[in-house]
Structures are given as structure tokens and as C-alpha cells.
């Protein structure tokens, strides 16, 4: 966003000064945006850093972290860094997070459960009722992290919203980021919100000065651009749905579409064929994730797709 770029440039001019370690202005801006209290919000060097901090405050050697798979690739890495044991749980046959299976995977050693919604890389969402049924059986001593990195691209109404569930459940913390819809991936800033006790614990293990002055300025300015954000995400959503229909991908609520493949080799071959056409997609063992941005780039992808499939 132009206002964010200008604010970051101004902040960069004072790069000889340390940033506000408490990110006070940013936290208050996020709290106002979410209609929460400042003590319910923590910021970090991207939401991925906050994921790592969640593992730090909940786990030690021998503890378990449960998460859907395939999902955000860093979840098992975060667990291992803390000495915890990753417990991946397969998705359903229709590429959705399997909440009953996640609940069944919880043991007395489980300290943290990640739920990525929309899920990365499949773009699928969970529904409100199944999340409440899931929470009804999750022990109150187990923390549930609702990872909403792609929240701004969601258009379905029947999916849990972090701002609602963290009020209803003290053992839920939600995560969002400025990297995706706001376009600030390069400056690294994300946020967590929920129970003030959880937020206080996150702050205790945060790296000092982890969110730069440039990142803080860009994030604050971005929050003021609600109309521009909606316009940007609406275009992405429209193009996402167009691409999904054109290639037969499954419906998505993120800024990408997921095309399942029968084999790892098929996914790798498809990614290479598209790369040869100047289009980069992400191959996984189970399929290909195709990021969608604007109309021009979607057209470029579809032209490359048609050249290798027709």
C-alpha cells in the first residue's frame, strides 16, 4: 500500500534509533482493529516467530505438538527446536483439516495443537460447529493455536473467527500476519491475540527489538487502509476462483489454489513444466500450490497451464 511504503521510508530515515521494544503504538492499533484490549495482543517477527514462541511457552522435551498434515511446513520444525515431538495428523480425503482426528491424537503429553485455517497449502477451511465440537473435547490444559495467516482472503461465513473464539475459549490463541494480504512479507511482522495470560507468556520469550521500526510503521499504516485492502483482496479472490475453475483445483479460501496429484513425480514434473514457461509454483509430495495475485498474473499462469496441458 502506498501509505505503508511512505511510512516505512520515513521510519528508515531514523534507522540509527532503536525501535520501540514494546511496539506500543502497533499493539494499540491492532487491538483497536480487532476490538480487543492491548493486553490481549502480542506482536512478533512474522506470525511464524509467534508460532515458535507458542511452542517455547508450552513445551519441553517429551511433550507433544499436534497439527494437521499436510499443513504449514514449519510446525514440525518448531516442535523439534523445543525438543518436543511432532504429531502430524492426516487431512481428510477432501483435503480438509480433520478435527475429530486431531482431537483423537491428543494425549496427556500434548501441550499444543495447531489448526491452520484456511489450511496451507490446501486452502480449505473448517466450519464453526465442528470447531466447537473439537474444543468441547480438548483438555483445558492444552493450548489451541488458530493460525489465520490467510484470514483476509476468506469469504465463507461458516468458519471460526479468531476474534470470537479467543473470547469464548481461554485456551485458544489466534495468529495473523501482515505478510500475505497486506504485502509486508519482507519486513516481517505478525500478531497473536487471546487470553492475556498467554500473551504475557509470549512476550516473556520474545526476542528484544524483534519487530523493527520500519515493520511497525508499515503495519500501522496498513491497518488504516481497510478500503484498499478489501479492494486488493477482492481482486485476488475473484482471480483465485477463476483459476480454480479453469484447472479443476479444489475450492480455496486463501490466496492460492491446490491441485492434488497422484504422485510426487507428477507434482514435480508439473512444477518444472510451468517453470520452463516462466511461472513458479510450489510442488509438494501430494500436489501443487499455485499462488494467485492479480488478473495479469493469473492470465500468465493460465496461458502457461494451457500450453502444457493441451
Regions found by a protein language model. Name each.
Residues 237, 241-277, 286-288, 292-296:
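Conserved PLP-binding catalytic core of the aspartate aminotransferase-like
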Residues 4, 22, 171-250:
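PLP-dependent aminotransferase class I/II
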Residues 47-48, 72, 117-121, 150-151, ...:
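Short glycine-rich anion-binding loops that position phosphate/pyrophosphate groups of nucleotides
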Residues 86-90, 112-118, 144-148, 250-252, ...:
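Short beta-strands and strand-loop turn motifs
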Residues 80, 97-108, 121-144, 148-184:
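Active-site pre-lysine segment of PLP-dependent enzymes
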Residues 16, 24, 57-115:
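PLP-dependent aminotransferase-like
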Residues 1-48, 53:
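N-terminal small-domain helix-loop-helix segment of the aminotransferase-like
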Amino acid at each position: 500500500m502506498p501509505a505503508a511504503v511512505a511510512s516505512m521510508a520515513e521510519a528508515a530515515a531514523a534507522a540509527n534509533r532503536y525501535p520501540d521494544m514494546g511496539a506500543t503504538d502497533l499493539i494499540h492499533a491492532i487491538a483497536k482493529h480487532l476490538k480487543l484490549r492491548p493486553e490481549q495482543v502480542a506482536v512478533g517477527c512474522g506470525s511464524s516467530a509467534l508460532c515458535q514462541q507458542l511452542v517455547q511457552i508450552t513445551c519441553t522435551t517429551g511433550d507433544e505438538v499436534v497439527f494437521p498434515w499436510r499443513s504449514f511446513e514449519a510446525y514440525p520444525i518448531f516442535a523439534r527446536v523445543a525438543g518436543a515431538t511432532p504429531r502430524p495428523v492426516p487431512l481428510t480425503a477432501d483435503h480438509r483439516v480433520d478435527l475429530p482426528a486431531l482431537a483423537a491424537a491428543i494425549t496427556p503429553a500434548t501441550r499444543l495443537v495447531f489448526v491452520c485455517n484456511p489450511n496451507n497449502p490446501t486452502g480449505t477451511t473448517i466450519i464453526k460447529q465442528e470447531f466447537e465440537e473439537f474444543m468441547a473435547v480438548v483438555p483445558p490444559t492444552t493450548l489451541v493455536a488458530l493460525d489465520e495467516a490467510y484470514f483476509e482472503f476468506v469469504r465463507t461465513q461458516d468458519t471460526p473467527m479468531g476474534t470470537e473464539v479467543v473470547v469464548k475459549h481461554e485456551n485458544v490463541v489466534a495468529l495473523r500476519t501482515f505478510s500475505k494480504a497486506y504485502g509486508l512479507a519482507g519486513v516481517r511482522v505478525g500478531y497473536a491475540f487471546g487470553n492475556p495470560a498467554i500473551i504475557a507468556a509470549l512476550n516473556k520469550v520474545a526476542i528484544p527489538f524483534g519487530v523493527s521500526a520500519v515493520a511497525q510503521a508499515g503495519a500501522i499504516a496498513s491497518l488504516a487502509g481497510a478500503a484498499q485492502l478489501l479492494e486488493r483482496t477482492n481482486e485476488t479472490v475473484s482471480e483465485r476462483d477463476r483459476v480454480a475453475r479453469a484447472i479443476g483445483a479444489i475450492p480455496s479460501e486463501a490466496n492460492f489454489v491446490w491441485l492434488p496429484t497422484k504422485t510426487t513425480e507428477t507434482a514435480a514434473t508439473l512444477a518444472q513444466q510451468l517453470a520452463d514457461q516462466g511461472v513458479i509454483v510450489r510442488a509438494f509430495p501430494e500436489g501443487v500450490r499455485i499462488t494467485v495475485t492479480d488478473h495479469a498474473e493469473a492470465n500468465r499462469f493460465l496461458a502457461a497451464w494451457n500450453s502444457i496441458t493441451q
